[in-house]
Structures are given as structure tokens and as C-alpha cells.
Amino acid sequence: TEPHVASSADYINILLVGQAAREGEAERFADTMILCTVNTYEKTVTLTSLLRDTLVQYPNYTDTNGKKHSGGKIKLTSIYHNGYICTNSTADAMGLMNQTLYSNFGIEVDYDVEIDFDAFIKAINLLGGINVELTAAEANYLNDFHDRYYYEVKEGKNWLDGSTALAYVRMRKAEGDGESDIKRTARQRQFMEALLAKVKKMSLSDVQNLANEVLPLVSVSMTNSQITDLLMKMLPMLSGLEIKSSGTCPVRARGYSWGDMVDIYGDGQIHSVMLYDKDKNVAYMRALTEGEGEIPETVPIQD
């Protein structure tokens, strides 16, 4: 028989959005966007950070009430907000996100998971906290929040509770971070790797119990039967699951730099954005998320 080669049927793409609002706040923006690509054949999960300052073209959109909205250019972080205000619903926020990711990068999102700050804190505490390796600069930054988070951290491995973990994944101004989002998103992937590594070591019954406690805290674009189906696919993989980080999307090709100054709306106001080579990024992401050809190694680069 022919050896099995991973095809699009083996891939599940889950978009995780950390939504920047607390209970009672009306504004909705995507503070964090991570694509989790599950390869059920190779038993891998690959994490890709979506850079929030990327300048994207979002499509004309029909919301869940049937009303039509015109597309345009905007930073990726604002796509969630633009979709949300159509009907004040997560469904339209994630719907516009999914359409934008497909039209700009060729990413086909299968499922969406949205979590806000308060739910993130609760979920991490339910998991019993996460152990994360901190640099001296990161520890110093977090210790500025000492009165708020009640305990100090140090350089090296530290246990983070939900509140401190939230400060860690949102950190942007630690010494050496610079102006870009690269180090911040790298921290978020490191945190997700540590979280998944902890879940890997849990018994199947404990994972199921954890899922039952966490799912009510988040918004998901799945029916109960789809959630059950996904768990049935994922649980047998856990013990041998390999967790990978692919870096960011977009990946910067030569000739593109961070912090391009662009008049997005033609109103004379200049905004710092991330520009990218669309064709090269689509080819890269299709290979990474759908198994279409070999993943290019020399075209997209991380500076």
C-alpha cells in the first residue's frame, strides 16, 4: 500500500482569540490571536501567532442579521471589533476574523475559541497554574505588579497563577522588548506550549473534567457534538503529542520591515503597521495549515 501522506483532512485549525475586555466593558478587541493547527496523522499541534498590527484587507461582509457591510483596510487587531459591532455578537466578530484570515493568508479556520481576561484567569487557576521560565527583565516587569498579584517572581522557572499569567502574556514593555510585537507573541506561544505540556500529563478523565469546567468560561463556534468529536480525536493523541511553534503570521519576506508608516484611511493620519508579501505568505500558510506542498524554508524569514 502507498504510505500515508498528511492531507487537508488530517488538519484541524482552531483560532484562539484573547479578547481585551473585562466583565461589564462594551469595547471588544482581539488582544491575542493564536492559530492552533492540529495534525491528527502526525500527532502535532503547531502554534502560530497572528500579528495584530498587520495591515489587512477585510472583505464585504453580511452579518448574522442579514445586513451587508462594506470591506476595507485596517489593522488585524481591529477586525474582531468591526465584526462585533455589527450585531454585538461574538459570532460576527469571529465570522469576520475567519473570512479575513482566509482572504489575506489562505487560512481556513475550522473552529473558534474566544476567552476574555476574567475567564483566562479562572481557567488558569482551574488548571492549577502554569510553570514558566522567566528572564530577569520579565521578572522585573512582573514584580512591578507586586501589590496587585501578591507575590514576587524571579529569573528562572516560576509558578504563575491566573492573574500573574495574564500579566505575563500581555507584557509588552519588558526591557529589551523593543517596539514590535515579536517578543510578546513569542511569550504567548511559550505559555501555550507550557499549558499544553501540562495537559499532556493529565489522565484522560482529568482532561475531560477540566474541559467540562473550562468550556462554560469561553465562547466556541462548536456544537456539543462537534466538541465531543474533537475531544475524541484529541484525547488518544495526548500522550504522544508534539507541540511546535511556527513563529508568526505574517512572516516577513526580505524587503519588508516592522513599523511601516501608512496613511490607512487617506485622512492624513499615519499609522505604524506590518506590511507583508501576500503570495508568499499564502503559500507558506497553506503548506503549514493544510499540507499543500512543502513548507518553504527560505522565502519567509524572521528577522
What feature does the model see in each segment?
Residues 1-303:
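Non-catalytic, solvent-exposed segments at the cell envelope interface
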